[in-house]
Amino acid sequence: IGLCLVGSEMCIRDSRTTGEIFETPQVAYMMIAATLFSKYPAKKRMAYVKAYYDAISTFKISLPTPVMAGVRTPQRQFSSCVLIETDDSLDSINATSSAVVKYVSQKAGIGIGAGNIRAIGSAIRSGDATHTGVIPFYKLFQSAVKSCSQGGVRGGAATLYYPIWHLEVEDLLVLKNNKGTEDNRVRHMDYGVQFNKLMYERLITGGNITLFSPKDVPGLYDSFFADQDTFKELYEKAERMTSIRKKTIPAIELFSNFVQERKDTGRIYLMNVDHANTHGAFIEEVAPIRQSNLCCEINLPTKPLSHCLLYTSDAADELCR
């Protein structure tokens, strides 16, 4: 079974028409080693190639899909997972969608940090329009993820992260279940729900969790990751303010909904953002952890993409920053 899996998904083949496989797994291992060390000095190169081949062909080193399936092809990309964060603007959302398509096409799994998008009904341009909510944009990201087949190796996949206190969280928790319609479900991504100590304290003490739109409480979303004391101060102050749109829900009810959806649908991850920052390799005040990857297994600092600039000149293609 393993041989068939490697041969059908990782070996070079004619994926468009006949499906003919052009190499065996051992040839693939040799080509990977030869490609990776092709720029090394000629006197040392073969020794490195052989040592690396011996390590990967005997499974002492496990290779991620982009390396295993694509590093010996013209489209070389070494990142197995890419973390992409969006801000609360159309330019940033479009830049994120563009980046998702680019990296999915290069066989990467995607982690999307999308918790900062304002909630449905929020004012846009000082009330010139009202926000449609996060679900239409999650659908956009889902379409971007599923737009490429990754060369027939595997379908695109992504996990999208948002905080448990987001104003739309009750609708977000059910995005994967089989109830509802296509209009209010986004089933083909996975989700990571983000918690911190304050949320657990509300649960343990039988308290409530107050839901906000991130846009309505400046600094709340950033401090959720970078400074727990500041987050608690802003959160409790916002709870007392009558001018801020909010919704209060018993913590036990919200946690129960999360657990039920996680049990029923699978792959709804729990991310403790305070522990991710205090127990990691990065300084939270300088480079806070704001999301994880496709499998919710790594912590790397991110910053939101600002916008994509598209050029029509022959000298420039696309710039995301």
Residue ranges and their predicted role:
Residues 14, 38, 58, 62, ...:
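Conserved helix-loop functional segments at active or binding sites
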Residues 1-7, 12, 311-321:
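Single conserved hydrophobic/aromatic residue that forms the stacking wall/gate
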Residues 79-309:
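Active-site cavity-forming subdomains of large catalytic enzyme subunits
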Residues 12-15, 186, 289, 320:
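Short, intrinsically disordered low-complexity segments
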Residues 8-9, 13-78, 84, 232, ...:
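Acidic/polar, glycine-rich intrinsically disordered N-terminal extensions of enzymes
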